[in-house]
Amino acid sequence: MKGPLFYSKILLFGEYGIIKDSKGLSIPYNFYNGALKTDENPSQEAMKSNESLSRFVSYLREIDAGLVTFEIETLASDVEAGMYFDSSIPQGYGVGSSGALVAAIYDKYAHDKITVLENLTREKLLKLKVIFSEMESFFHGKSSGLDPLNSYLSIPILINSQDNIETAGIPAQQIDGKGAVFLLDSGIVGETAPMVHIFMENMKQEGFRSMLKDQFIKHTDACVDDFLKGDVKSLFKNTKQLSKVVLNHFKPMIPQQFHELWKKGIETNEYYLKLCGSGGGGYILGFTEDIDTARQSLKDYKLEVVYNF
């Protein structure tokens, strides 16, 4: 048995900010995917995934039935029979590994599910987001529900604020454009929960809160607007500012060995780096006006282009 594929995602803008009502923009990333599967001879990895699913089933039994109900016994017996999530999405990389799993489970086992084929009103999108937030919180404490939403619908999503989200049309790519958004592999697995904990601790300080509002959220919102309008010039100006703010105020989320590289981008204007997801490792997002220059400048690292300007 093998179920339909669910894809990874990239939160282009809005990491951390969306916890505090900044704008955000999330796009599907079809390079990685996952599907529910059962094998005759499962690998170690499949068995590990199966164990995790079995704990997930217990968690889903306790979810508020007013919110969502599942074919829970069917799910439990499928898991009992060895079902696992077969995924190429790297875990701890900020591209939504648990989100795709949540989307796959909802798709297959939820009652009265909202589907991508119907007219997706704001209410329906929000309801899905709340359901997914509840489901995904099993994996890392506090989830916004956005990753599974993106994976489930496989369309770009614009977050205007916590309770105002909509599907978005993003400008068509210029396939031979020199400008690019890319992923840089840090080679380190990042853990989401401790990073979110650091952020929440910082939020207790007045100075950090006002920096978030006056700098981080301001530039994040501007980046989202620029990207959707296709205003590349302004986008790079704002991305540079955002990159600076992150370097100055989100240092623990940037792996130590990337601090200099981060600074170099800002100083040379060859590329600007930002967090991809919660940081701490995994992928780092990069924006450049000239991908060849960026590749040269970052030649010791593996870059994957995800969007061309």
Language model regions located:
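ATP-binding N-lobe of GHMP and related small-molecule kinases
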Residues: 1-95, 107-123, 272-275, 280, ...
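Conserved hydrophobic/aromatic beta-strand scaffold that supports enzyme active sites
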Residues: 3, 9, 148, 156-158, ...
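Glycine-rich, charge-dense phosphate/pyrophosphate-binding loop(s)
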Residues: 15, 19, 217-309
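Phosphate-binding site recognition
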Residues: 98
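Buried hydrophobic packing segments
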Residues: 101-113, 149, 284
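Short, well-structured alpha-helical segments that form the helix of a local strand-helix-strand
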Residues: 122-138, 232-242, 295
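Alpha/beta catalytic cores of group-transfer enzymes, especially the acyltransferase/condensing modules
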Residues: 123-169
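Acyltransferase
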Residues: 169-224
